[in-house]
A protein has these predicted regions:
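Short, Lys/Arg-enriched, Trp-marked, Pro/Gly-tolerant hinge/linker segments that flank
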Residues: 2-3, 126-132, 181
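Helical hydrophobic small-molecule/effector-binding pocket
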Residues: 71-119
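An amphipathic alpha-helical interaction segment
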Residues: 85, 137-146, 164-167, 171
């Protein structure tokens, strides 16, 4: 029951963000839209920033629990599509004091996508977990930078084109990084 209430509050917040910026949304607006009392909100969340963080983490967990992408390109495109589905929410959060919540959300999703690829490719290499984590984080920050730039410019450019351009630039880089750091087994 608790998650149902949290998701209802989250849906109310997202709905309100279609109408006004986050700094104009109050707890009362959210609870009225949701049909619950203010105490219910405060039972689950400390403040709106806490709800934003929970919403980001909940959305990320849905993606993480979903099907495994067949390639990093498919996973990266999935990230763009997820963001575009919640465009009003993402843009509002991106341009607010809660931007760090959105960044953590994106970092966790992109980390998962890159980790799957690195884990699969690195199985034939002798590389430490620390070295793999360095590679994953390198690509995570690179890819998130591209996503943040896209958000900053209003999400206008077609995500498929961005993924194709990124793929052209990054083709073979994970394998090359593993070649440079590890010993390949035949």
């Amino acid at each position: 029951m608790s998650d149902i209430t949290k998701r209802a509050l989250s849906a109310s917040l997202k709905s309100l963000l279609l109408e006004k910026p986050i700094d104009k949304v109050s707890v009362l607006d959210i609870t009225n839209r949701c049909g619950v009392k203010r105490q219910t909100f405060y039972y689950h969340f400390q403040d709106i920033a806490d709800l934003v963080e929970w919403t980001c983490l909940d959305d990320a967990s849905k993606v993480i629990a979903g099907k495994k992408p067949s390639s990093w390109q498919e996973g990266f495109l999935e990230v763009f599509n997820l963001i575009k589905q919640d465009k009003a929410f993402v843009l509002n959060i991106y341009h607010s004091v809660s931007r760090d919540k959105l960044e953590l959300y994106l970092y966790s999703i992109v980390y998962r996508v890159i980790k799957q690829v690195v884990d699969e490719v690195s199985s034939s290499y002798s590389v430490s977990d620390e070295e793999k984590d360095f590679i994953i984080n390198f690509f995570k920050y690179s890819f998130c930078g591209i996503v943040f730039n896209w958000i900053d410019k209003g999400m206008v450019k077609d995500p498929k084109i961005i993924v194709e351009q990124t793929s052209s630039l990054c083709s073979g880089l994970i394998v090359r990084a593993l070649d440079n750091l590890g010993v390949k087994h035949n």
